[in-house]
Design a protein with these regions (language model features):
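A short, Lys/Arg-rich alpha-helix, primarily the initiator
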Residues: 1-13
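Residue-level signal for the short linker/turn that defines the boundary of a DNA-recognition helix
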Residues: 13-15, 40-43
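Key DNA-contacting residues within the recognition helix of helix-turn-helix
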Residues: 31-32, 41, 60-61
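Generic structural marker for isolated residues within well-ordered, non-membrane alpha-helices
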Residues: 7, 16, 45
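Short alpha-helical DNA-recognition segment
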Residues: 13-32
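Short coil turns linking two alpha-helices in DNA-binding domains
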Residues: 26-29, 41, 55
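DNA major-groove recognition helix of helix-turn-helix/homeodomain DNA-binding modules
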Residues: 43-58
């Protein structure tokens, strides 16, 4: 499973816009992460992992 698929699964019923705001990225950046078109910076990976109470490794590797 790609990290984009994992992010979509973790997002659940929330909109991309809602999650993007909660994590502190733009909606377009979040959409690109889900489509595997862009890889988040390490700092953003950590914020995403913390938001979902997961490790960076669980989501991105």
């Amino acid at each position: 499973m790609s990290f984009g698929e994992k992010l979509r699964e973790l997002r659940g019923e929330k909109t991309q816009e809602t999650i993007a705001q909660e994590v502190g990225v733009t909606k377009s950046a979040w959409a690109m992460y889900e489509r595997n078109e862009r890889v988040p910076r390490d700092e953003v990976k950590l914020r995403i992992a913390n938001h979902f109470n997961k490790s960076v490794q669980e989501i991105f590797f």
